[in-house]
């Protein structure tokens, strides 16, 4: 069941991406010849308003084929008025951006839905105090509940670390609820050097406490939900861009690249963990698709945007030979990355 849900999620994300291209193309009067979910043999086809809507055998992607556009050979053109070819560079760029934009919009919608359903949080209750830590020396105890930090109300555990690290003061004031008493504790955090998820050294202020597992949820109002959704979409996009940058620079190894097997497996597990977990992971995949499609690789939207930006800036098109060979290189690179991802997936399964 989880596997089928994973395929359904991927199909929905691909449909949304291609729908973005479709809507923008039709807005500018471009005829869309084919709208396909999946590749390979077409299992189902229905023609509506001159567009063949298809479901194909291999559900690992999808495509919109516009009149006058051929990703496998960009030199194949049509000069009819309803052709992609005759549109101006800025119109083509908008059509190309519409796909990734649709993915970011889908992630935003999912994060907004999460904000209304209730974001999983932990209550600000101490589960453990590290020996000889600043919290230990201040005599904080297990089951203490942190009410405020520097007179700012604390409702959830995640706010504690942020408040400590954002504080401009050397000494931080904690208001603690213990049994039926309210206590004030002034604590000087210690600074530790740690590695983040990208292997970078960062300084972090800590007082030496860990959370007690007391789950709760944080529900946002309508306007605050929009802000939460925007922030989460932006954070996910930034993280993925930075991950790609670290892979290119060699700071993150190629063995960390995951393929379709990992995506399906993790999505299936997320679906078994509940609706919120599925929404979180689906939003992350959607942002991932949006970011990856913006990379300046000729086989992707970003590559086509690059060609059109060149034409917009210089006033002339890239030569047919340059476009053809760069596109072929892009496909080889893309297929190579997909193969590497699948290899890493299989390697992880075997080990």
Language model feature labels by segment:
Residues 79-83, 87-90, 194-291, 305-329, ...:
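Functional transmembrane alpha-helices
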